[in-house]
Amino acid sequence: MTSAAVTVSLEDLKNGNVSFQTLVDAFGPDSLGIIVVKDVPEEFVQLRHRLLSYSSYLGNLPQFRLDKIENPASKYLTGWSRGKETLKNGQIDTHKGSFYANCAFYVDPSLDCAKPTEEFSPANFPEYLSPNLWPSNIAGFKETFEDLCRLIIDTAVLVARACDQYASKEIPDYKPGYLEHVVKTSTTTKARLLHYFPADADAKEESNDDDWCATHLDHGCLTGLTSAMFINETKQVPAIPITYSYNPRYLPTLAELDSSPDPTAGLYIQSRSGETVQVKIPRDCIAFQTGEALERITKGKFKAVPHYVRGVRPGVAGGENDGAKIARNTLAVFTQPNLGEIVDLDQDISFGEFARGIVEKNTTK
């Protein structure tokens, strides 16, 4: 089934006009665990289109260039990866390509990764303390990536502020302003640009619903999401021109399909009642879903949301897209506490300790 997520305006967030009931409807025990923010700054639409176009350019680079931006030591939590995660059935996930970047630049433009602590160093926790690996010779990629992430994190700060107002009233001993502080000051926030490769026309359709991205919980606080962009990569091959007669600031944006050629492709959430719900995010909006750290910080008042993603099935596109290679691109920004921040007061667990266990569980051996 398809369901509309709770929607609020950016202006209401800025003015503190989001009611507690709205937050409970969005994030509470009986919710989908997702909120959509509308009326975001105008530049968001342009930045989204440009960065999600870059996702196809990146995914179609020659393998030798992609190899240069892989970082196995970080368990692929910086740079490019493909085929480094496992699906529910134990198979290696080659359906999607992933580019991770640290968003420490939001706090300090000179930072390329999280700040080390006494407990966590680049040697013992490279997953969060390895510097970014930006692809070379992709004009405007880094600039666009950082600009879009800043805008999304700015909005996440406002969502966090609204959550704090609720938590201060409803949770005993809650530290006022804690979640906003976490989102605004964190150097561990990460962004993930995703490229779901066009399905092989000869591939057999999987019977499992979550065959493209196994059902999981995000382990941060609030995950900012763009709507997905669908691209016909047969009609417009996303190859970077070898030479330009001038030095462009950005690569050309790619044409976005009006809608997904496969109505089953997209983001799915498992509701609290056990139903599987498809959630659609408008192109000019930013969605935020809850992660495990937020559930712990709010002592279960706000629940982490189990979710998965399906790409476009082979052979379902019709009309002018019949037989075409259809890619799905999107961006997720995981706002997370600093490594030393306590996310579970009862058990005295820091985010670094919590994240280390999650990363170990999710990475292929």
Residue ranges and their predicted role:
Residues 1-365:
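Peripheral, non-catalytic segments flanking oxidoreductase cores
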